From Swiss-Prot:
The keyword Transmembrane does not apply. This is Dephospho-CoA kinase. Signal peptide: none annotated. The keyword ATP-binding applies.
């Protein structure tokens, strides 16, 4: 059995950049956000359960999930948010574990799980080690304001809805400092990968 590495960070710390670097290095990566979309595609049991609970009006004309509408509903209603998580989370977990199993059967020795809310969702047990992509909170705030065109207050509200990046870094087995150049970030990514995969 190979090793599973959890990749996480906070909003605008650069996790997507590191995720791309890992894939460019030829290492398999299973993305929780993609899994979350797959398990509610038309024809899935996940979507059927969502429609049964939220009603047909949660669908777009083409039968796909109206994510914007659903997002507004669950943002305001804790009970409905918990119900959605109850429907989707076990399916996302199953999707990711099945994908990992396929990679291991194909002879891969290292698989990354890209999970934005790894700590918040208490999914540490799915992985052998955890990488946190870190920047200073000041850099995180600046990047988020620029990237999403947000006010300082809006950006802080998003950042504060998650566990702080410094706290996540303390829980990590390995921290990638993404506060400087992309070259320095890439060097850290490759250094980590080389610890596990000698022939890549």
């Amino acid at each position: 059995m190979g090793k599973t590495i959890g990749l996480t960070g906070s909003v605008a710390t650069g996790k997507s950049t590191v995720s791309s670097m890992i894939q460019q290095a030829g290492i398999p990566l299973v993305d929780a956000d993609i899994a979350a979309r797959k398990v509610v595609e038309p024809g899935t049991e996940g979507l059927k359960e969502i429609v049964a609970y939220f009603g047909e009006e949660i669908l777009l004309a083409d039968g796909t999930l109206n994510r914007a509408k659903l997002g507004k509903i669950i943002f305001k209603d804790k009970e409905k948010r918990e119900k959605l998580n109850e429907i989707t989370h076990p399916r996302v977990k199953e999707y990711m574990l099945e994908a990992r199993e396929r990679f291991f059967r194909a002879g891969e020795e290292l698989v990354f799980f890209d999970i934005p809310l790894l700590f918040e969702s208490h999914l540490e047990s799915l992985v052998d080690q955890i990488i946190v992509v870190w920047t200073t909170p000041e850099t995180e705030l600046k990047r988020l304001m620029e990237r999403n065109n947000l006010t300082k207050e809006e950006a802080l509200a998003r950042i504060n809805s998650q566990i702080g990046i410094d706290e996540k870094a303390k829980k990590a087995d390995f921290v990638i400092n993404n506060n400087e150049s992309l070259e320095k970030t890439q060097k850290q990514v490759y250094t980590f990968i080389e610890r596990f995969v000698k022939n890549k």
